[in-house]
């Protein structure tokens, strides 16, 4: 099935387009408000190189900076955190989009059509289980990933380093069936209240503890639940994941693991 037929909704969204000189504090506010994986940086359809900022690129750049310079980071132009976007034509097969995710290890891409374009992400694709466009004869336990956890008094800086090292977007709280995400961390540290504190003491930007953040309780499914059931309404949740006894289940697990195993059926 073609991308255009599988996920036509991607061209109906409205994205703010950042100028390369947009300050990081403004860019991050827009990223928080729109609750999406990335924002494009001033480009036009047809250009050979597409740039964007993502939560991952912003946080990884922040960790490279000394705490005393966190204030300077907020004033930097957003282009300093830019990453090159992978692009694909809307006329390509759905599997080609998934293979692009597999290659880049990022769960989003820029999809182009004549005169229009938009982001496609794994979050868009999990609903395809419900309408039968994709399917896999696997259960939740077959695709679950290990649960990594940290104490709730862990500061945000070390927590982010832990998440980046393991290439995970969620970390659970030790002793609790709750977790935080990279998106949740962005929403917290770049909120108005935290930025007011950081304006006076920039070095404290990442001093908050995980327990200070909004902790999320994942929906539980049985180990033997079908992937269709595990995927149910996952795209409606910004912090989408499920948990079973075998581990945590994310959109990547739901789609990419069956693909990698050669067990994902696509219409």
Model-derived features: positions:
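Conserved active-site beta-strand-loop modules that form the wall/rim of enzyme catalytic pockets
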Residues: 168-170, 182-183
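Tandem CBS (Bateman) regulatory domains
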Residues: 1-14, 55-86, 98, 102, ...
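Short glycine-rich, polar/acidic loop-and-turn segments at beta strand-coil junctions
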Residues: 22, 43-45, 57, 61
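The conserved cystathionine-beta-synthase
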Residues: 17-37, 42-43, 86-106, 111-113, ...
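Short, solvent-exposed loop/turn segments that connect beta-strands within catalytic domains
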Residues: 45-51
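Short hydrophobic/glycine-rich mini-motifs in sensory/regulatory modules
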Residues: 51, 115-117, 246
């Amino acid at each position: 099935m073609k991308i255009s037929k599988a996920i036509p909704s991607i061209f109906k969204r409205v994205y703010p387009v950042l100028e390369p000189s947009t300050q990081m504090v403004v860019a991050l506010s827009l990223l928080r408000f729109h609750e999406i994986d990335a924002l494009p940086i001033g480009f036009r359809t047809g250009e050979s190189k597409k740039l964007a900022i993502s939560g991952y690129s912003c946080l990884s750049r922040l960790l490279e900076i000394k705490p005393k310079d966190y204030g300077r980071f907020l004033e930097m132009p957003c282009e300093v955190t830019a990453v090159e976007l992978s692009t694909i034509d809307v006329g390509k097969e759905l599997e080609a989009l998934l293979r692009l995710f597999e290659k880049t290890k990022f769960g989003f891409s820029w999809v182009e059509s004549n005169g229009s374009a938009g982001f496609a992400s794994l979050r868009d694709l999990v609903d395809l289980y419900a309408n039968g466009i994709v399917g896999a004869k696997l259960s939740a336990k077959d695709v679950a990933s290990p649960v990594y956890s940290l104490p709730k008094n862990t500061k945000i800086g070390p927590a982010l380093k832990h998440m980046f090292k393991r290439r995970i977007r969620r970390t659970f709280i030790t002793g609790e069936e709750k977790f935080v995400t990279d998106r949740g961390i962005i929403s917290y540290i770049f909120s108005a209240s935290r930025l007011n504190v950081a304006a006076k003491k920039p070095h404290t930007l990442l001093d908050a503890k995980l327990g200070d953040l909004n902790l999320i309780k994942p929906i539980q499914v049985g180990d033997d639940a079908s992937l269709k059931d595990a995927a149910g309404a996952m795209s409606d949740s910004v912090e989408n994941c499920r948990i079973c006894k075998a581990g945590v289940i994310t959109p990547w697990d739901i789609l990419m693991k069956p693909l990698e195993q050669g067990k994902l059926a696509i219409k």
